[in-house]
Amino acid sequence: MEEEKDDSPQLTGIAVGALLALALVGVLILFMFRRLRQFRQAQPTPQYRFRKRDKVMFYGRKIMRKVTTLPNTLVENTALPRQRARKRTKVLSLAKRILRFKKEYPALQPKEPPPSLLEADLTEFDVKNSHLPSEVLYMLKNVRVLGHFEKPLFLELCKHIVFVQLQEGEHVFQPREPDPSICVVQDGRLEVCIQDTDGTEVVVKEVLAGDSVHSLLSILDIITGHAAPYKTVSVRAAIPSTILRLPAAAFHGVFEKYPETLVRVVQIIMVRLQRVTFLALHNYLGLTTELFNAESQAIPLVSVASVAAGKAKKQVFYGEEERLKKPPRLQESCDSDHGGGRPAAAGPLLKRSHSVPAPSIRKQILEELEKPGAGDPDPSAPQGGPGSATSDLGMACDRARVFLHSDEHPGSSVASKSRKSVMVAEIPSTVSQHSESHTDETLASRKSDAIFRAAKKDLLTLMKLEDSSLLDGRVALLHVPAGTVVSRQGDQDASILFVVSGLLHVYQRKIGSQEDTCLFLTRPGEMVGQLAVLTGEPLIFTVKANRDCSFLSISKAHFYEIMRKQPTVVLGVAHTVVKRMSSFVRQIDFALDWVEVEAGRAIYRQGDKSDCTYIMLSGRLRSVIRKDDGKKRLAGEYGRGDLVGVVETLTHQARATTVHAVRDSELAKLPAGALTSIKRRYPQVVTRLIHLLGEKILGSLQQGPVTGHQLGLPTEGSKWDLGNPAVNLSTVAVMPVSEEVPLTAFALELEHALSAIGPTLLLTSDNIKRRLGSAALDSVHEYRLSSWLGQQEDTHRIVLYQADGTLTPWTQRCVRQADCILIVGLGDQEPTVGELERMLESTAVRAQKQLILLHREEGPAPARTVEWLNMRSWCSGHLHLCCPRRVFSRRSLPKLVEMYKHVFQRPPDRHSDFSRLARVLTGNAIALVLGGGGARGCAQVGVLKALAECGIPVDMVGGTSIGAFVGALYSEERNYSQMRIRAKQWAEGMTSLMKAALDLTYPITSMFSGAGFNSSIFSVFKDQQIEDLWIPYFAITTDITASAMRVHTDGSLWWYVRASMSLSGYMPPLCDPKDGHLLMDGGYINNLPADVARSMGAKVVIAIDVGSRDETDLTNYGDALSGWWLLWKRWNPLATKVKVLNMAEIQTRLAYVCCVRQLEVVKSSDYCEYLRPPIDSYSTLDFGKFNEICEVGYQHGRTVFDIWGRSGVLEKMLRDQQGPSKKPASAVLTCPNASFTDLAEIVSRIEPAKPAMVDDESDYQTEYEEELLDVPRDAYADFQSTSAQQGSDLEDESSLRHRHPSLAFPKLSEGSSDQDG
C-alpha cells in the first residue's frame, strides 16, 4: 500500500511534463508557420517565360529528334520501345487471366411479344353497348350483301323486319314452299336440311343465335322476278327460337328509288357466287360439271330465223352506217401467240389465246376511231369510274375494272367512236381488213347485215332492253372457224357472247390435272361470259368453237355503258347466270356463308367444336397455340386463298389452336354438315380431300419440326411455307422513325424492287385524295374506301401503304390495312423510338412489325442494332439495307419524281438490298446453307465466288461448324475478295503446330484448352454482333445440357461461331452466356441445316455439303470379334486386310446418327438445291491446302450453276412462288395490272383523263407514264399488257386467234401476207 502511494506522485509528474513538452512543440510549429507565410508574402515568386527565339529553338530541336529516330523505328533498329510495348501487352494479358476479366457484350433482351400479337379480343359482337337496335345489328352483321347499302337505304329496309316465334320442330319453310326472305336467329337454333333423292333429310347447317339463313341466289330470283319454290331445302327450329325476317320483296322499293344500287347488289351476289361458291366447290373439292346445268337455256331466235340463210363467213360487223376506207396494206401480221403459250392438242386441250390485234392494224383502227361519229352517249347520264367514288355504279365499275369517262369529253368515250367493219381473213394466222363501200356492197355482206340486225333484235329480247339504240355501235358480229379459242380460263378481259349459229364449247381445267372437261354447250340463243363481265373477276372457264360459229359480242366496257343508261339490264343478264347453275349449287348456297371478321376477333378458339372449314377471301388470320404451361406461341398465319381449320373438321377433333383476324378479313364458311352431304352425293370429293391431307402430311414430313401453319392448307399448287410469316402478304405499310428518314425515296425504291416480282401499287395520302377525292378519308366514305382498297389487293401482287409522318387518318388506315408494318430508321443515327411508334403502341396493332435500318453506301458498317431492338419489344425482326446515294439525295418532290421516272425504266438489281427485302416480303427468299467438314469447308469459299459470278442472290445465310465460320464472313463482308483474304489468313493460322502445342492441356474434357482457338476466331470477327450483319444469319450448335439443337440468330458472332466449331474431344464445350448451357459442334445434330432455313422463310435453299463420307463396305466378322485376331490381321503383311471400326470410330458414328438422317431428309426435299464439291480426298485438318480446295469448289460451282442456268433452275428460283413472274419492270410501270386488261388505261391512251380522275398507280407514276407515251407503237407488242394500252371498239373482237386446231403458229413479221394453215 505504501509503494502504491509513492508511485502515484511520480506518474502525475511524468504526465504533466509530457503535456508541457507537447505544448511547447506546438507553439514552435505555429511560430515557424507564421514566419514562413510572412516570408512568402514579402517575396512573390518570379514568373519566368520563354523568349520567342528560345521557344522556336526548343520545338525545332524536338521535331529534329523525332525525325532522327523515325528511320530507326521503321527498320526496327530500336528494339527498346517495342520490347516495352510487348511487356505491357503481356502484363495486361496476364492480369486478365489472373483476375478473369470478361468483356460485356451487348445482349438482346428476351421480351415477350405484345399481347395484341398473340391474343384475340375477349369481347365478342357487342349488342348491348350499341346505339342501334339489336335486330338491326344482327341483320347488318350477318347478311353480307346488305353492307353495300348506304345507311338511309339500309334503315329503310329494316322497316320491313318482322319477328317470328318458332316452336321446336316448326318449319320456317318446307320443300316446295316459297320463302323469299332473309332470316336471322335472335335466340335459339335452326337446322337447314336438304332432301336426298331417297327422301331422307340431311342437316347441312346449324344456325345459332346471331347467324342467318338465306340464299343470295334465291334473293336474286325475287329481284329479277323469277321466284320459284325450294324443291329440296327446308329450315326448321331445333329448339324454341326467335328469328328476324326480312322479306326479299322489300328490295323492290329501294331499287326503284336507287337503280344504281341494284347494279351494285347484283354484282356482289355474282361475286359471292364466283368467289365463295366456285372457290370452295371447284378449287378445293374438285367439282366441275356438277356445278352447272347442261340443259339448253336458249331463247328462240325469231328474228334470225326469219332472215334467209346464207352469209359471208368470217366477217366482223360493227355497224351498218359507216365503213372503213381501203387501207394501204390489205393484210397485216398477227401475233400468233402473244405472251407465250403451249401448242394445242387434239380434244379438249386448248391453245392459249390473247385478245390483242396486231399493232399495225390497231394503229389504223385508232386513226379511224379518232374521227367523230354516231353513238355519242347521252350527256345527262351519270358519271362513273374510279374518279367517281360516290356512286354505286362507280363502285361496280371499279370492281369490274372498267373506266367510264365523263360525258363532258365525248371524244374520249369508247362509245363515241365511229363503228367500223373489219374482216378476218380465211387463214387463221393472219388478220386482214376488208375495204367496203356502199356502192360495192356484195350480196353476201347484205345478208350478213340482215342477220346482224336480226340477231340484235333477239339480243334485245333476252337482255330486256327497252331502247334498241343502246346496242348501236356496242355490239359486234363475229364469225370464227372451227378450232378457235375465243377466251381462255383466267383471262381478265371478258366479253358477253350471244351465239347466233353454231356452238361454243365451255371447258374447265380439272384441279391437279392438265386436262380440260367440257362443262356445257352454248347453243344459239344462249349467252356465255356474263358472270366474269358482271364481277370483274377472271374467267373460270375456257370458251372454244369446235365448229364454225357466229355470235354477237359485247365487251365489258360497252356493257357497262349500256348499264349506265339502263341499270335494269343487269337483271336479265344475271338471271341467265342463275339459270345455268345446277340445283346442287342452289342447295349449297344455303349452307355457304360469307363472313366478315373485324381485326382482333377470333373466328374460333382452342378447344372449340370443329363444325366448319374457312376459306380466306381477303385479309389475314393468325393461329396461336396455348401450351400446357399457359404460354402462347405463334403457330402460323394465313393469307388469301388458304384453308383454315380443315384438318380438325375432317377428323372431328376439337380446335387445336385459336385463330383471330390480324386485320379486317373476309372468309367463306363451309359447314361440316354440308361437307358430309357433298361427300355422300359425290364420292369423288373424298379423293380430293385425301389428296389435300396427303399434301399436308407430306409437307410436314419434308419439313421436320416446323413452326408454321400446323393446321392450314395453302392454295392449289403452292408450297408448304410453314415457318414464313411473309407467306401470302398482300399489303405492307411503311412508316418512319423520325422526320429525317427519306420515306418517299424508300417507298419508291421498294416499289421498284417489288415490280420485278409482280404488279405493285404504292398508295399515299396525296395519291388517294387525287384519285378518290379530298373527302375519301372521311368516316362517311369508310365503306367505299375499304372496298376500293380491297379491289386493289385483288389486282396487285402487293400493295404498299406509305404512312404520313404523324398519326393522321391516313396513317391509321395504313396500319389497319397492313399485313406487315415496316418501321424505317437511319442506321447512323442514335437509337430512338419515334413518336409515331409510341402512339401506335398504345393501340392494339396486330400486324407483325419489322425494323428496317438504312445505311449509306460509303458509310460505316451496321452497329448498335441491339440497342434499336431492345427499345422495341413489338418488332419481330430487322434488316439492314445499304441504299444507293439517290435515296439520301435532298431533292424536292418534283425532282425526286423526275429522277425515279428514269430509275423505273431500268430493271431492278437483283443483288441490291431492296431486292432482298422484296423477296423476303413476298416469300421468295433464297437461303444459302453451309455444312460442316473442317478444312473441306474451304471449298465453300470457291463456291461463293461462282455463286456471285452466276448472278444468284442470297437473302439468308446459315451454317454449321466451318460452315458457320464461312457464312459469318459472307454475311459480314460485302466484298468477296476481302472475305477470301480473311478466310485464308485464318486457315494459315490453323496450320501452326506451335500454337496447337501451346494450347495442349491435361485431357480430362478435351485435348486442347480452347484458348488459342478462341483467340484465332476472335481475331477474325472482333466484337461483331450477329444482329449487325448485312445478311440475316444463323448458326447451329448442339446443346448437350438440354439435348437439343440450338439456332442462334443474335449475340456475339465469334462466340457462337466458336461454339458451332467445338468438336468433341478436341475443344471443350462453350458455356452459353445467356443461360449457361454447354454448346458443342452443331454437326452432331444437323450438319446441313436447310430445314432450319426453310422454316425461317426461305423459298429455295442452296445447300453446300462438305462433310466426310463414311465407309460402308465393312467386313462381316460374324457374331463375335477378337481383338487379338484384328491385331494379327493388322500386323501380318500377308494376311487379308479387314475393315472393322475401332471404338473411336464407333463413337463418332453414333454421334452423327441424327445428323445423317436429317441430311437424307433435306436432300430429298423439293425446296433444297443440294451441292457437294469433289473434296473427299482432303482431310479435316488440311487447312494448308486452302487455295487448292477453294479452286475445286469454284470449278464445281461454276459447272453446277451453268447447268442450272441452262435447265431453268435459276429461273425457277427467281420466279414468284404465287405464279410466274408477270412482267418486266417497264411493263409493270406502264400498266401495273399488266396481266389484266385495264379499260381505264385503254381510254386514257386515247384521251388523257382529267386531273381529278387520274387512274394511275401512284402520284409518282403519273409522270412516268407521260414519258412512255412517246414509245413507238410496235414496242408494245413485246408486253403482255398490250391490250391494256390501246383502246378501240374492236378490243375483244377483231383480235380473236384463228388457228388450225392442232398447230401453233410462230409470230409473223410486219407485212407478211401469208402463213401455212
Curated annotation (Swiss-Prot):
Keyword annotations of the record: Endoplasmic reticulum, Hydrolase, Lipid degradation, Lipid droplet, Lipid metabolism, Membrane, Phosphoprotein, Repeat, Transmembrane, Transmembrane helix
Annotated residues for binding of a nucleoside 3',5'-cyclic phosphate 3: 591-696
Transmembrane segments: 13-33
EC number: 3.1.1.-, 3.1.1.5
Residues covered by region (Involved in the binding to lipid droplets): 659-945
The organism's place on the tree of life at top rank: Eukaryota
Motif segment (GXGXXG): 932-937
Motif annotated as DGA/G, chain positions: 1081-1083
Transmembrane keyword on record: yes
Family per record: Belongs to the NTE family.
Name of the molecule in the record: Patatin-like phospholipase domain-containing protein 7
Organism whose genome encodes this protein: Homo sapiens (Human)
Lineage: Eukaryota, Metazoa, Chordata, Craniata, Vertebrata
